[in-house]
Amino acid sequence: MSLTSSLLSRVLGGGSCSREELIALSREPLEELCQAANAIREHFCGNVFDLCTIINGRSGKCSENCKYCAQSAHYSTAVEEYPLLSDEALLAGARYNDARGILRYSIVTSGKRLTDEDVDRLCASYRHIAEHCGISLCASHGLISKKHCEQLKAAGVSRYHNNLETSRRNFPNVCTTHTYDDKLQTIKWALEAGLEVCSGGIMGLGETMEDRIDMYMDIAALGIKSMPVNFLTPIPGTPYADMTPLGEEEQLRIVALVRFIMPDGFVRIAAGRNTMKDHGRKIFMSGANAAISGDMLTTAGVTIREDLAMLAELGYEVRMK
């Protein structure tokens, strides 16, 4: 029996894989690995697929120096800069996605963390959306206190998003203005406040396969059931502008491994999907069962209409409101 088959049987039986086993699994034949990851997805999650959307609620002028990010004030990029959008603009985005059956809508803001005034304004916006629209609300506002998490939850937010981005080992190579532990603390506070959490990373930041496994194992250890997988889109003007994007085989291998790490949740494909020739079709048969649809924060995405058509062809049942 191959290593892939052996670990598949264990996971289907409710077991888990060690770090060393996952590293070895990452070197197994790709087709068998992807088929096994898809079998795990079917066993634990069926054909349910989760689509969400995001809106860039405040853009640019971020104090942080994340080397991949177009919104960092440390780099000269062509990103549009604007302050926090109005209640009506944020509501319009929610209504647009709600009308298309999208289950979740997230407001994302640039910046290291929110001020008390920012939180008050955003909570008013979340309440305004909740009063006029039935879409589920997510929030992504950087590092955040437990008190602010509690305020967001009271305003109608059900899930907080905060990516670890990369492994503890690689993090200082990517960002020096905040730490891996800062992000872990934010996640823990969100969980303590009663919010669900969505957390993953960006692939293609110079990390190793071991780094990827370490990061997703850290996330899984927190009980998180929504794990985004982003693929770097190099942005002109950033230090990572000349990074070589990952190839299809490596992308598929990563997604399959995440499914082995988290058998029963949503492996969510996010940034970088628009650069794939098939817009993620192979990945959605290799363990992934969720995606961000529409545009990303500063890059183009795949339209909701295209996603719904493709997922129907693949036999998925998209979670709708």
UniProtKB/Swiss-Prot annotation:
Cofactor: record remark: Binds 1 [4Fe-4S] cluster. The cluster is coordinated with 3 cysteines and an exchangeable S-adenosyl-L-methionine. Binds 1 [2Fe-2S] cluster. The cluster is coordinated with 3 cysteines and 1 arginine.
Binding residues for [4Fe-4S] cluster: 62, 66, 69
Domain Radical SAM core per the UniProt entry, residue ranges: 44-273
PROSITE patterns: RADICAL_SAM
Involved pathway(s): Cofactor biosynthesis; biotin biosynthesis; biotin from 7,8-diaminononanoate: step 2/2
Keywords tagged on the record: 2Fe-2S, 4Fe-4S, Biotin biosynthesis, Iron, Iron-sulfur, Metal-binding, S-adenosyl-L-methionine, Transferase
Entry coiled-coil feature ranges: none
GO biological process: biotin biosynthetic process
Domain of life from the UniProt record: Bacteria
Cofactor(s) needed for function: [4Fe-4S] cluster; [2Fe-2S] cluster
Binding positions ([2Fe-2S] cluster): 106, 138, 198, 268
Record field: catalytic activity: (4R,5S)-dethiobiotin + (sulfur carrier)-SH + 2 reduced [2Fe-2S]-[ferredoxin] + 2 S-adenosyl-L-methionine = (sulfur carrier)-H + biotin + 2 5'-deoxyadenosine + 2 L-methionine + 2 oxidized [2Fe-2S]-[ferredoxin]
Gene Ontology MF terms: 2 iron, 2 sulfur cluster binding; 4 iron, 4 sulfur cluster binding; biotin synthase activity; iron ion binding
Primary role: Catalyzes the conversion of dethiobiotin (DTB) to biotin by the insertion of a sulfur atom into dethiobiotin via a radical-based mechanism.
Assembly: Homodimer.
Family indicated by similarity: Belongs to the radical SAM superfamily. Biotin synthase family.
Protein name: Biotin synthase
Species this protein is from: Akkermansia muciniphila (strain ATCC BAA-835 / DSM 22959 / JCM 33894 / BCRC 81048 / CCUG 64013 / CIP 107961 / Muc)
